Amino acid sequence: VHENFKKDSAALGASLMRSGMAQAGATYCHGPTRLPLLRKNPRGHAEFLRQFCEHSAQGSGLTSIGYQGRRPSLYKLQTEIAHIAVPTFIMVGDADEPCLDPSLMLKRTIPHSQLAVLPDSGHGINLEEPELFNRLLGDFLATHG
């Protein structure tokens, strides 16, 4: 799985630098993990796309290639992650397919962790469900902050 992520990160980075942010945004910002935001909040999605397109194509491309694609897999860091001693709150959208399994792994690995799976939500849960996101986070911080 991580090898595919590396390849995808390299391809995205090359595409960003070759075609620019507007072209990349037309596909990346309309991918399956971003569609719930478009459906729930078209104006919010348009703003997300606008801000995405304002980023530097070279900077975003190099970040995708040089950082995203090269960072170690969370699965390879499980031993270190298991030593996290502070309460940890993990949130994920149920339509954010690439993040579901890693989120569950984090929940199982971090001793004092909680996992919230937001229904009918993608990768932008704070933009898609701001009230629910803020309430859940606020409750966690009130208990553990």
Q: What is each model feature region?
A:
Residues 81-85, 108-110:
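Short, conserved loop/helix-junction motifs that constitute active-site signature segments
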Residues 112-145:
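Catalytic active-site module of serine/aspartate enzymes centered on a nucleophile-bearing elbow/loop
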Residues 83-84, 90-92:
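Short beta-strand/loop motif that positions the catalytic acidic residue
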Residues 78, 104-105:
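Active-site phosphate/pyrophosphate- and oxyanion-stabilizing loops and adjacent acidic/basic residues
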Residues 1-28:
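Flexible "cap/lid" loop of the alpha/beta hydrolase fold
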Residues 97-102:
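Conserved alpha/beta-hydrolase "acid-adjacent" motif
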Residues 46-77:
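Hydrophobic, aromatic-rich cap/lid helix
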